[in-house]
């Protein structure tokens, strides 16, 4: 049985620019505050996924979409959708070595999220998603 519709949902299209990636992080933080959810690790995951959309999912004239949703009790789902469905991220070991200056975004997402993955479509899109658990405000 599919999860019921999320009780809380935020969705926004953003430009595929560094400014758009920064705005994704800032808007996510404000939305999490308004929902009284912890900022981290969600804010860090949004930053990494948005940066990847800008660096690897850029198509001139197209945007990327950030979605935040509470999908189950105490689970936040983060989705970033871009229009480069032909460029899927690969779950690979760290091949850059200890001195690499980039290439660790999805490794970081994998460490911070309870689970993450990629969904293809609708053409020409792909969505990279991550889920993180949190302690509800009433229990903090």
List each language-model region with its residue ranges.
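Conserved beta-strand-loop-beta-strand hairpin that lines the nucleotide-binding pocket
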Residues: 1-11, 54-140
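Bergerat-fold GHKL ATPase/HATPase_c domain
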Residues: 1-41
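Conserved ATP-binding N-box helix of the HATPase_c
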Residues: 37-61
